[in-house]
């Protein structure tokens, strides 16, 4: 199964990045402003109609599983590995378990890059670019 992979260096300690990944307020400020629910380990959070279960929320690993309704994402896992080195936190990101590398996967790969840069801006500068203020890569998307 193909995966989406990205790497992002953030000039902040891992605890600050972890907080942005494991609180609804954090996720709301870098990914989707419509996020609600429980983003702690064992919780479930939503944005619009999309649902994600938090499988792991440890200081060096955050893992979510998507449960619907976007068919291409159902059962996929979104993983953030946090590594502190050289005075920065490296986020090793993967969106795992795609059934096939279709056009939507290409779109999502680019969108994940924009949202990881939004995460970086949130942690470093105090303001991210969550949906709907995110960088658009196609008309309306």
Please place each PLM-identified region on the residue numbering:
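Hydrophobic ligand-binding cavity/cleft-lining segments
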Residues: 1-36, 141
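Hydrophobic pocket/interface hotspot
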Residues: 17-21, 27, 45, 54, ...
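A short, polar/proline- and glycine-enriched secondary-structure boundary/capping micro-motif
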Residues: 29, 73-76, 101-107
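Hydrophobic-ligand binding "helix-grip"
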Residues: 36, 45-99
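A conserved amphipathic terminal alpha-helix motif
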Residues: 97-141
């Amino acid at each position: 199964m193909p995966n989406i992979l990205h790497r992002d260096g953030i000039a902040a300690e891992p605890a600050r990045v972890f907080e942005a990944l494991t609180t609804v307020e954090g996720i709301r400020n870098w990914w989707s402003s419509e996020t609600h629910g429980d983003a702690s380990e064992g919780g479930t959070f939503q944005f619009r109609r999309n649902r994600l279960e938090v499988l792991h929320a440890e200081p060096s690993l955050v893992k979510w599983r998507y449960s619907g309704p976007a068919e291409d994402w159902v059962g996929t896992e979104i993983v953030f590995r946090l590594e502190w080195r050289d005075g920065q936190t490296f986020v090793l990101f993967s969106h795992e378990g795609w059934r096939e590398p279709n056009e939507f996967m290409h779109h999502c790969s680019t969108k994940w890059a924009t949202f990881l840069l939004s995460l970086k801006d949130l942690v470093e500068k105090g303001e991210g670019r969550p949906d709907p203020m995110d960088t658009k890569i196609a008309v309306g998307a």
